[in-house]
Amino acid sequence: MNGQNIRIRLKAFDHRILDTSTREIVNTAKRTGAQVRGPIPLPTRIEKFTVNRSPHVDKKSREQFEMRTHKRLLDIVDPTPQTVDALMKLDLAAGVDVEIKL
């Protein structure tokens, strides 16, 4: 697989789970002899929701909730076939969305 790069994008709501999953991928790739660029932290997406506290009156009384989506980017340069096999067998934590581009 000479001349190819594997780009991995990870997304999660909890940054601790995201960082441990990223570390697992980096350690697996380095163990199999591939060069890793990253992890590169991408901007966190913050969605805010504003709702009324009471069901029908008191428009001035509101509550805000937010949902944060943390993202990381990894590039694996010139992966070996062993690297690809190891990454396919890797079991990551639940709650981590993985996108892989070749």
Curated annotation (Swiss-Prot):
Coiled coil: none annotated. It comes from Rhodopseudomonas palustris (strain ATCC BAA-98 / CGA009). This is Small ribosomal subunit protein uS10. PROSITE patterns: RIBOSOMAL_S10 (PS00361). One of its GO terms (cellular component) is ribosome. Pfam families: Ribosomal_S10. InterPro entries: Ribosomal_uS10, Ribosomal_uS10_CS, Ribosomal_uS10_dom, Ribosomal_uS10_dom_sf. Involved in the binding of tRNA to the ribosomes. Gene3D superfamilies: Ribosomal protein S10 domain. PANTHER family: 30S RIBOSOMAL PROTEIN S10 FAMILY MEMBER. One of its GO terms (molecular function) is tRNA binding. GO terms for biological process: translation. Part of the 30S ribosomal subunit. The keyword Ribonucleoprotein applies. Transmembrane segments: none annotated.
